[in-house]
């Protein structure tokens, strides 16, 4: 990415009176008048698109060349040019991928082109909408990055829309998967690049690191080249700068993933660390809860008691001198105990080919590029008995909040933005604009049911699956972790029911499992992998039976993620239904509610007014969790701002 991007440094988040005025500006950006104006433009674009239906290919290409020239001269063009361009892309979409944008898709593309976050309900065709907006940006001749929630969606969307981009004279590439530096450099030369936020930010940090390291050598080499003594220096940057970014599933990227900064790191060998980690694992095995230490599962804190301190002191002679201090000993043992009490295989990580691979809680996917810091990753490896890796040393870091505010043009779309409207405007200056649905939604939402124990809940889920399965309708059950998906599958087998399981263990079968999930009588259990971007098509027989039935069997820390799962049914006006079946042993309830409050909840009946109270407790716990996550995101951004202010000095 070129040094030009460095000129656009993000301004601080408005505070005080400036913050109040900024908030009023955000309300103005989201007012209904803007929606009405964009809907009028979308109606005009739809009519103009239909007028191109019988236009010969030669005339269509002439119009394409003329429109491209106009956009290259001025991206934020007048309404006439914009409507002509959008209508042309719509007709080319029909000829290239047999999809003609609906009016609401035109509206979404226009909203993104004008810098809004278009909130489009799940199933409304965001993939095509994003592509229309990306073509307009690509015509400008400046770099456009389309951010997807994961590598699967990156590859899928780029592949599906490639014929449209080619028809519009725009080059496209996908930055997902494992690419060599040369392949990645070539990828970033395309007009439109589909890539995940983590990959793009990591490449940006690598560019900055390479620039700093090579500054002196570059000056010397450039001088030699000018005098004919050396070849022209090769481009170090992976891209053409930070100009336009379009974020699909924007709340996942800007909210869920922004809790921690992205750290570019490299393994660093620390003498004696592996031995110290194994020593701590042995000490932890000898300790007894309540006698030697306490483990608070609500706050996830370990407190070492006198018995633990005595055992550590007695065994300290086996440590290298640098690890013998009381502070270091206690940190090592706390990590070892945390692994045993708070970090669970199948929920937080998997063991694959003798390696610990972390799982993303929001997406349910494996993240082999990630590792835990401060020796915690090595503590997990010691507990699982796999070879210990070296800890990573930070080479550079940046928050997503800081990174995305460096783009000149910033827009996106998602189906679940309303809960985060204020934060999206306050941090990113990104106003949310709701887009109406193409057809009225027919989803039936049943009341939430909350059970006392996990076993009671699994039995209720099995009974619900059996009842709906008997009618011939397909069922999708959403859970949070790999272990929960496998546990529920075993319960269904005991009831004589079989189910396809989609989780991080069998991610390679994702496309095949999703393709069958809408078939009559099919039962699918899925982690959050199926929560975003998953289009479950229905057979005609399935529609006549009532469509897909979604069971939310575990609540997430944010209600937005639950709504994403619910959105797998009732897409494009299809019939469907949703029910939420939970228990008082959900992680978010245990972390956010006091033991006394949970005790009172267990004494309540499961019907009538009490059922509403229990459902209200779930929403209360989720709101508390979301508030904590916002505090973390704010702290991350403040840390970035402090670094930006301190490092120049």
Curated annotation (Swiss-Prot):
Alphabetical list of InterPro entries matching this protein: Helicase_ATP-bd (IPR014001), Helicase_C-like (IPR001650), P-loop_NTPase (IPR027417), SecA (IPR000185), SecA_CS (IPR020937), SecA_DEAD (IPR011115), SecA_motor_DEAD (IPR014018), SecA_preprotein_X-link_dom (IPR011130)
GO molecular function: ATP binding; protein-exporting ATPase activity
The reaction(s) this protein catalyses: ATP + H2O + cellular proteinSide 1 = ADP + phosphate + cellular proteinSide 2
Primary residence: membrane
Enzyme kind, highest EC tier: translocase
Pfam families per the UniProt record, alphabetical: P-loop_SecA (PF21090), SecA_DEAD (PF07517), SecA_PP_bind (PF01043)
SMART domains reported for this sequence: SecA_DEAD (SM00957), SecA_PP_bind (SM00958)
UniProt keyword Protein biosynthesis present: no
Function: Part of the Sec protein translocase complex. Interacts with the SecYEG preprotein conducting channel. Has a central role in coupling the hydrolysis of ATP to the transfer of proteins into and across the cell membrane, serving both as a receptor for the preprotein-SecB complex and as an ATP-driven molecular motor driving the stepwise translocation of polypeptide chains across the membrane.
Protein name per the record: Protein translocase subunit SecA 2
Provenance organism: Magnetococcus marinus (strain ATCC BAA-1437 / JCM 17883 / MC-1)
